[in-house]
Structure formats: structure tokens, C-alpha cells
A protein has these predicted regions:
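Serine-hydrolase catalytic machinery in alpha/beta-hydrolase-like enzymes
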Residues: 9, 14-98
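Catalytic histidine-centered segment of alpha/beta-hydrolase-like enzymes
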Residues: 74, 186-198
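Short beta-strand immediately N-terminal to the catalytic nucleophile in serine-hydrolase-like folds
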Residues: 104-107, 131
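Gly/Ala-rich beta-loop-alpha elbow adjacent to hydrolase catalytic centers
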Residues: 107-115
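A conserved short beta-strand
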Residues: 124-136
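Acidic catalytic loop of the alpha/beta-hydrolase fold
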Residues: 136-137, 158-163, 188-189
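Short beta-strand/loop motif that positions the catalytic acidic residue
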Residues: 147-149, 153-156, 160
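Catalytic histidine neighborhood in serine/cysteine hydrolases
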Residues: 173-189
Length: 209
């Protein structure tokens, strides 16, 4: 069972978060939740499951609420300011880790879109996991070159209408280094595939260095 404590990421705006920080941990992962306009927050089941999978591999974990969600200050910014929220969370976790203080990034659904955008924006990462990326939605933008020094995972359910196999295959052609995992029978919410998702994320987290 992951042991977390509530924290606040200071900044403009301040962000509500949950941190699990093993003593002396040099590696960590920031987790981005799904779309806040559709009820997504840091307690979304997939985000919690992802944090638990990473924590079992010894990584510090930081789940946070985007601006305007829960106790986070600010207001919805159409995905623009939310990218700054991701960067603030990455910087906050880095400050709390032991050297070399390397941080990976994982995002689910809308959170995967922002994680990919931040990785393509030059943020140096120890790994990237895109969970159920919404490839078939207008909000998805194919990322450019990614600044990643570790494993890249793309995982989706076979029954996910927002991440069809054709779009997933197209993404794999521009991310040849990615481990692409399709979970049979799982939908966008992984309601029938949380165990398989847990295994895929634990394997990814074990490769973060």
C-alpha cells in the first residue's frame, strides 16, 4: 500500500497534490490526471493505480490536481496553463529527491496529451508513460522530438474508442523507441484491464533510471 501525504505545490497558481517520498529516493514520477471537464482529478482510479505500480518499484510519486480542480487555485485554461502546472510539478518533485534527482512523467488520457506536449517542449525526463492517449480526439497533437533519457511506454485498451489501433500504429511509427502495449478487452477506463495495466506500468517504472 502506497504511503502518501497531502502537499501543496507552491506557485501561481498553487496546486493540490499527494506525495509519496521514500527516504533518500533519487528517482520519481509525476502523474497527470484525465480531463477535468469530465470529472478527472488526482484520485482517478487509473492515476491511483499508476502511482501504486510506480511506488512498488521504489519511485517517489507525485499526483496533483490541475488548476481549478479540487483545492488547486486558478481556473481551467484550455490546456495551456495546465502545461505549466505539469512543469511546476516536475520542478517540485526534483527539489525533494536525492541526487541525481531524476523525474519521469506519466499521464492518463488528457494527462497523456499534456505529458507528451511537455516532453516535446524540451523538459528533460527520465521516462515517459502515455496511458490511454486520446489519439482520435481534436485535442491531441502529435508531439515532436521528445527529451527523454529513459523508457517510453504507450499503453491503451483494445476497446478504447479514443485510441484506435490504427492511430496507435501511426504513433508508433514516429516513436520507434516506444514500448506499445495493447490490453485486450480494456476500454478507455481500463475497467476490465487494471491488472494488466499495473503490470505494464510496473515494468516501465523498473526501467526508469
Amino acid at each position: 500500500m502506497i504511503v502518501e501525504r497531502p502537499v501543496t505545490i507552491l506557485g501561481e497558481p498553487s496546486l493540490e497534490a499527494a506525495l509519496a517520498l521514500p527516504p533518500g529516493a533519487p528517482l520519481g514520477v509525476v502523474l497527470c490526471h484525465p480531463h477535468p471537464r469530465y470529472g478527472g482529478d488526482l484520485d482517478s482510479p487509473v492515476v491511483v493505480a499508476a502511482a501504486e505500480a510506480c511506488a512498488r518499484q521504489g519511485l517517489a510519486t507525485l499526483r496533483f490536481n490541475f488548476r481549478g480542480v479540487g483545492a488547486s487555485a486558478g481556473a481551467w485554461d484550455e490546456g495551456r496553463g495546465e502545461r505549466d502546472d505539469v512543469r511546476a510539478a516536475l520542478a517540485d518533485l526534483r527539489r525533494q529527491l536525492a541526487p541525481p534527482a531524476r523525474v519521469a512523467l506519466a499521464g492518463y488520457s488528457f494527462g497523456a496529451s499534456l505529458a507528451a506536449a511537455v516532453a516535446a517542449g524540451g523538459e528533460r525526463l527520465a521516462g515517459l508513460a502515455l496511458i490511454g492517449p486520446p489519439l482520435a480526439t481534436p485535442g491531441w497533437q502529435r508531439p515532436g522530438p521528445l527529451a527523454i533519457d529513459g523508457p517510453l511506454l504507450v499503453v491503451a485498451g483494445s476497446e478504447d474508442p479514443y485510441c484506435p489501433r490504427a492511430a496507435l500504429a501511426a504513433l508508433a511509427t514516429v516513436m520507434p523507441e516506444a514500448i506499445v502495449t495493447v490490453i485486450d478487452g480494456a476500454d478507455h477506463f481500463f475497467s476490465a484491464g487494471l491488472e494488466a495495466l499495473d503490470a505494464a506500468l510496473a515494468d516501465w517504472a523498473a526501467k526508469v533510471w
